[in-house]
């Protein structure tokens, strides 16, 4: 129902406003941990779109390759790839605290396994009661984190020369 969704969005907005200072503080803590890392963003399947959005923010704002995956799907092949993982990678799990018990255990085992390969594993807990509130909260934290990382790395988050090059090249076809 649209009215219910609007009410949830309003609650999400109110949460972000109320938590603004905490969001920025948490974002800076995340940024400091990921500053020199390749960000890897994981979420439960129902929050995969958020993980992708966060990956894109790291791509665009810090001009940094990143990737995103979702539990339990990443446990099929990607977890094997962590056999070659190392400290170049920094993992952020978007923890919405609403996993079923089996998937919560899966998360703990997965993060422990990945933690054997990299020293940076961040279990970022959402605030909020609804999926919309949790999504808006985590999105805000990590949007700020991507901007803070760009600043820490002296990267111009506005610059998009490679996109301009692509557009100019395509215009000549």
Residue ranges and their predicted role:
Residues 1-173:
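A SIS-like phosphosugar-recognition module
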